[in-house]
Curated annotation (Swiss-Prot):
Pfam families reported in the protein's UniProt record: Plug, TonB_dep_Rec_b-barrel
Organism: Neisseria meningitidis serogroup B
Function: Neisseria acquires iron by extracting it from serum transferrin (TF) in its human host. Acts as a TF receptor and is required for TF utilization. Binds both apo- and holo-TF, via the TF C-terminus.
Name of the coding gene: tbp1
CDD domains, per database record: ligand_gated_channel
Signal peptide: 1-24
Misc. remarks from the entry: N.meningitidis cells will only bind to human TF, not bovine or porcine TF, explaining at least in part the bacteria's inability to cause infection in non-human hosts.
Full protein name: Transferrin-binding protein A
Keyword RNA-binding: no
Key words of the record: Cell outer membrane, Membrane, Receptor, Signal, TonB box, Transmembrane, Transmembrane beta strand, Transport, Virulence
TBDR beta-barrel domain residues: 187-908
Length: 908
């Protein structure tokens, strides 16, 4: 049978078919109507572009501060809302752990501010038998977006640009200067912003002041934020929830053991014999069914997200002096503090009959006076006794503090008549610490009081503290030189980057102890018969005394386990040198190539830390062919690397003294080819990429073969063990409909973004065992983002509608295998759930009130659609920083329903 092939029109084809002929017609019309016009001098601030560093711009996104305002970016999750292929890594307790790009995440994606690397995600192993998967925070400090002038997001290996960590990509922030606040022709500038986000009840207030007098200038930005957890769709938390709570059995029926009677010595003032008629029976317990709102429910079946209180304060101060029109010296002082206070309400607040073991604990059920519940308890952590009258609360308090100060010298030669067009010398001293504290209370009725503590009036109350502080400090010297020049009618744009870094990493374990209020108790036994046996005729004789609070330190030193509170110190230094030359070969082609050499040396007083010296050479090469004025053909190849993190260097400790391991850098190779259509109609880019990763570091053993049998060799630990490869498609475009057809309004536009990743390969080195193949839970499901908007030509007002569609998370990306001995393997799965397809529609707009005021508003999830993103559900995956375990229901991961954002900006 003959098949009939039909050509299907879609938005992409329609755009190209209509745009290209019109563009060609416009070019001819322009050539026919050329006129000699007066010279107009226009001054404009240079904007960062996708091709500033690398000629092709493949895989890159650049957002200016104006773009961030227009997209109403108020936090890290808003930054990549409409950018498929890059996602935020949820830390599991309100914070974040960087970004995921092309199947990799956390420390495998470089994060810098003004060229200075931010803190690593340091995940320390948790205590054995606990509910936590990480003892430390595992977060990466977040950036204050009101301080940001521009952000460059690079997808694909690019260590030749950003060095260590740019294995799969990078996110580079550039902070504002006084010139970004002071308007053209003015000597001062003031900007104020007040914003509210309904999805997390977040309020942002920011004020920027800048001034210039003579050659002196200064910038000061202060930003304060506060908010709560992101609220799930209202339907996800509807109704009530029920649970069992262990309570005193006030309505105890007759029966039970005949040996349940006792008298209290302190209540028998006339002797034992006289008190036999004041018998007491052992108190007993029962499970009582309770029904509460979904907000108050605690347990694995909780429907709502854990409550969170978030706060942030940031200062950025940049004074400087223009010595003349070419030379500038300045300084920068930055301080940002962020707090994330969370209560883990997936931990049940109350005991049940499953926790209660009658008759096994001394004095169980005995009591003084009428306080029948005072000695009803269960045995908890560290053999502590915890009363049933209190509720348990588990709280995580995180404090992220960043301090940076530095100086810089900038040389800018607009005439370009010396050896350098631009040079910058800088020194930055940066310190970041993440203070993470676990507090477990059992001293208030329902467990909600974080500040309660055991005391003499609360028998069998309990408290636990566990604190980890991770700190990184850096002293970074940077030098940048740029020069544009011509040789044989070929235009060169040469840049040289040099840097030297001294760094230190420290993990401190402290405030690790238990407190338990214990009541004095004794069973009094007479010297001669009859001996009490608990019967009515011969009741037990007990003494119940005062309650004292016992504090038990858990910290140990030098035992190489989680309880080891010896500080983990790793220091070192490194340097790099990079050269990039982007060459324009007339109008037909651009080529670029770059190379970078990195050196790092580390040391530690702990001889079990895998320190050493690493040398790495990275490169990139790109070409842009321009066969037509309306089309570019692009190709890019680049490499990336990641050095072992400080946590991996410290290793996995299980009590024994470990040998150091020879950890090599992880490596990646990126190839990407694209086609770009451009003209009056806008631009459209489609590209195909292929990324290979090798020597990925994972936990496992080496193998050895003897007499035909393979066995595990050496200590367990982190080793170069995994290889992986992905491929995919990326589409990015913006259509100017007025450029397509002049009859349409000037300012009407459409945007298009699409990203798809397919796993090609994942394997384990043959000389490794008990290693799981790389699981691609970090891959974002395929996503389309379509936009239709209008901006008034004079910038008075604008409106934009964004439609996002995500495919389901592929089960193939979650499946893997664990290599065992002698060729055997176990199937592994990253997560027990995956997400279904979803879509969401957002509408946002702005209106400029007169000249100085801009009102912005947005309605997100306009149709109030209930959906769940993979980024949220991924918190239950094995690779999560703080994995959510024993999840009963997944409602808590639902995205917000219809929500609103408002902001008012003032610029003077």
């Amino acid at each position: 049978m003959q098949q009939q092939h039909l050509f299907r029109l879609n938005i992409l084809c329609l755009s190209l078919m209509t745009a290209l002929p019109v563009y060609a017609e416009n070019v001819q019309a322009e050539q026919a109507q050329e006129k000699q016009l007066d010279t107009i001098q226009v001054k404009a601030k240079k904007q960062k572009t996708r091709r500033d560093n690398e000629v092709t711009g493949l895989g890159k996104l650049v957002k200016s501060s104006d773009t961030l305002s227009k997209e109403q970016v108020l936090n890290i999750r808003d930054l990549t809302r409409y950018d498929p292929g890059i996602a935020v890594v949820e830390q599991g307790r309100g914070a974040s752990s960087g970004y995921s790009i092309r199947g990799m995440d956390k420390n495998r994606v470089s994060l810098t501010v003004d060229g200075v690397s931010q803190i690593q995600s340091y995940t320390a192993q948790a205590a054995l038998g606990g509910t936590r998967t990480a003892g430390s925070s595992g977060a990466i400090n977040e950036i204050e977006y009101e301080n940001v002038k521009a952000v460059e997001i690079s997808k694909g290996s690019n260590s030749s640009e950003y060095g260590n960590g740019a294995l799969a990509g990078s996110v580079a922030f550039q902070t504002k200067t006084a010139a970004d606040i002071i308007g053209e022709g003015k000597q001062w500038g003031i900007q104020s912003k007040t914003a509210y986000s309904g999805k997390d009840h977040a309020l942002t207030q920011s004020l920027a002041l800048a001034g210039r007098s003579g050659g002196a200038e200064a910038l000061l930005i202060y930003t304060k934020r506060r908010g709560r957890e992101i609220h799930a769709h209202k339907d996800a938390g509807k109704g009530v929830q029920s649970f069992n709570r262990l309570v005193l059995d006030e309505d105890k029926k007759e029966g039970g053991s005949q040996y349940r009677y006792f008298i209290v010595e302190e209540e028998c003032h006339n002797g034992y014999a006289a008190c036999k008629n004041k018998l007491k029976e052992d108190a007993s317990v029962k499970d009582e069914r309770k029904t509460v709102s979904t907000q108050d429910y605690t347990g694995s079946n909780r429907l709502l997200a854990n409550p969170l209180e978030y706060g942030s304060q940031s200062w950025l101060f940049r004074p400087g002096w223009h010595l003349d029109n070419r030379h500038y010296v300045g300084a920068v002082l930055e301080r940002t503090q962020q707090t994330f206070d969370t209560r883990d309400m997936t931990v049940p607040a109350y005991f049940t009959s499953e926790d209660y073991v009658p008759g096994s604990l001394k004095g169980l059920g005995k009591y003084s006076g009428d306080n029948k519940a005072e000695r009803l308890f269960v045995q908890g952590e560290g053999s502590t006794l915890q009363g049933i009258g209190y509720g348990t609360g588990v709280f995580y308090d995180e404090r992220h503090t960043k301090n940076r100060y530095g100086v810089e010298y900038v040389y800018h030669n607009a005439d370009k008549d010396t050896w350098a067009d631009y040079a910058r010398l800088s020194y930055d001293r940066q310190g970041i610490d993440l203070d993470n504290r676990l507090q477990q209370t059992h001293c208030s009725h329902d467990g909600s009081d974080k500040n309660c503590r055991p005391d003499g009036n609360k028998p069998y109350s309990f408290y636990k503290s566990d604190r980890m502080i991770y700190e990184e400090s850096r002293n970074l010297f940077q030098a940048v030189f740029k020069k544009a020049f011509d040789t044989a009618k070929i235009r060169h744009n040469l840049s040289i980057n040099l840097g030297y870094d001294r760094f230190k990493s420290q993990l401190s374990h402290s405030d690790y102890y238990l407190q338990n209020a214990v009541q004095a108790y004794d069973l009094i036994t007479p010297k001669k018969p009859p001996f009490p046996n608990g019967s009515k005729d011969n009741p037990y004789r007990v003494s119940i005394g005062k309650t004292t609070v016992n504090t038990s330190p858990i910290c140990r030193f030098g035992n190489n386990t989680y309880t080891d509170c010896t500080p983990r110190n790793i220091g070192g230094n490194g340097y790099y040198a990079a050269v990039q030359d982007n060459v324009r070969l007339g109008r037909w082609a651009d080529v670029g190539a770059g190379i970078r050499y990195d050196y790092r040396s580390t040391h530690s007083e702990d001889k079990s830390v895998s320190t050493g010296t690493h040398r790495n050479l990275s490169w990139n090469a790109g070409v842009v062919l321009k066969p037509f004025t309306w089309m570019d053909l692009t190709y890019r190849a680049s490499t990336g690397f990641r050095l072992p993190s400080f946590a991996e260097m410290y290793g996995w400790r299980a009590g024994e003294s470990l040998k150091t391991l020879d950890l090599k850098p992880e490596k990646s190779f990126n190839r990407e080819a694209g086609i770009v259509f451009k003209g009056d109609f806008g631009n459209l880019e489609a590209s195909y990429f292929n990324n290979a990763y090798r020597d990925l570091i994972a936990f496992g053993y080496e193998t050895r073969t003897q007499n035909g049998q393979t066995s595990a060799s050496g200590d367990p630990g982190y080793r170069n063990a995994q290889n992986a490869r992905i491929a995919g498609i990326n589409i990015l475009g913006k259509i100017d409909w007025h450029g397509v057809w002049g009859g349409l309004p000037d300012g009407l536009y459409s945007t298009l973004a699409y990203n798809r990743i397919k796993v090609k390969d994942a394997d384990i080195r043959a000389d490794r065992t008990f290693v799981t193949s790389y699981l691609f839970d970090a891959v974002q499901p395929s996503r389309y983002v379509l936009g239709l908007g209008y901006d008034h030509p004079d910038g008075i007002w604008g409106i934009n509608t964004m439609f996002t569609y995500s495919k389901a998370k592929s089960v193939d990306e979650l499946l893997g295998s664990q290599a065992l001995l002698n060729g055997n393997a176990n199937a592994k799965k990253a997560a027990s759930r995956r997400t279904r397809p979803w879509y969401v529609t957002d509408v946002s707009g702005y209106y400029n009130i007169k000249k100085h005021l801009t009102l912005r508003a947005g309605v997100y999830n306009l149709l109030n659609y209930r959906y769940v993103t993979w980024e949220n559900v991924r918190q239950t995956a094995g690779g999560a920083v703080n994995q959510h375990k024993n999840v009963g229901v997944y409602n808590r991961y639902a995205a917000p329903g219809r929500n609103y954002t408002f902001s008012l900006e003032m610029k003077f």
